[in-house]
Amino acid sequence: MPGLRAALPAALLLLSSFPPAAAERLPWPQVPGVMRPLNPSHREAVWAAWTALHYINSHEASPSRPLALHKVVKAASKMIPRLGWKYYVHCTTEGYIHGENAGSCFATVLYLKKSPPVVHGKCVHAQNKKQIQEEDHRFYEYLQHQKKPITANYIPDSNGNIAHDHLQLWGLAIVGSSYIMWKQSTEHTGYLLAQVSSVKQQIRKDNAVAFKFIVLLHEIPTQQLNVCHMYLVWTLGHPIRVKYSCAPDNHGLEDGSGQDSGSAAGTSHETKGNF
């Protein structure tokens, strides 16, 4: 069956074009506790919206219809004394896989200095939620009944194409990677899923499904690619459970070996997760 071309959401292209944080200056004094409006296209507004969607994707755990940012409609921020910056965003969303209209979300994102961002969000879905749940259920049952582990490499391929049979695996990778990207995001550093280098199912005897992924995450604004080894466990109706370790990829996207090691801001050799 012909593959589908993986088109980056417009908001991803906008995000990757932003200059480093030092190149921008806020046009007002940074007064603690004072709410300040943000230009919806401002880098921090877009990053806060993506941070919220990473959190929502990892907790809703729907590989059939993960969410991507379409655009930020309205945004504001304020400094919370002794904690950090808190962002308030209203954004429209689209399907991460197909780019269809997916609704809108309201969220707050509090960036802490030594902990993952604290996110509270609520989304209004344009799609039929029951249909999404049924698609997830069919995919889940399909995975549960596998006698031979599912394996795949390079999703999307070097031409940006995704085979139809790999679309939901790509969706599952988005959901799992969203957990990592939420945990690693800061006020000035964001992440996007660039490619699944490899994926292999781990056959289990319980009612969960599990996969080992090697994924490439695009770090913004450094443009660095980070290799993450991700062990994902999915139980239908529950948030994804993820263990991961990440390091820079020195060979680039097309190599996809995921075997290099190193260190960088926002990445770690130490295995982390929510098990």
UniProtKB/Swiss-Prot annotation:
SUPFAM superfamilies on file? Cystatin/monellin
Question: What are the BP-aspect GO terms?
Answer: biomineral tissue development
Enumerate the subcellular locations listed in this protein's record, separating them with semicolons. Answer: Secreted
What start and end residues bound the annotated signal peptide? 1-23
Keyword Secreted present in the record's keywords: the answer is yes
Show the coiled coil region(s).
Answer: none
In terms of one coarse class, where is the protein primarily found?
Answer: secreted
According to UniProt, the tissues expressing it are described as:
Expressed at high levels in the uterine and isthmus regions of the oviduct, and concentrated in the eggshell.
Where do the segments described as Disordered lie?
254-275
Q: Would you name any one GO CC term?
A: extracellular space
Q: Which UniProt keywords apply?
A: Biomineralization, Protease inhibitor, Repeat, Secreted, Signal
- InterPro entries per the UniProt record, alphabetical: CYSTATIN_LXN, Cystatin_sf, Latexin
Please list the residue ranges annotated as the Cystatin LXN-type domain.
32-131, 151-255
Keyword Repeat present in the record's keywords: the answer is yes
Molecular function terms from GO? metalloendopeptidase inhibitor activity
Gene3D superfamilies referenced in this protein's UniProt entry, alphabetically: 3.10.450.10
Compositional bias per record (Low complexity), positions renumbered to this chain: 256-268
Family, as annotated: Belongs to the protease inhibitor I47 (latexin) family.
Q: What does this protein do?
A: Component of the matrix of the eggshell.
Name the UniProt record assigns to this protein: Ovocalyxin-32
Organism of provenance: Gallus gallus
**Source lineage:** Eukaryota, Metazoa, Chordata, Craniata, Vertebrata
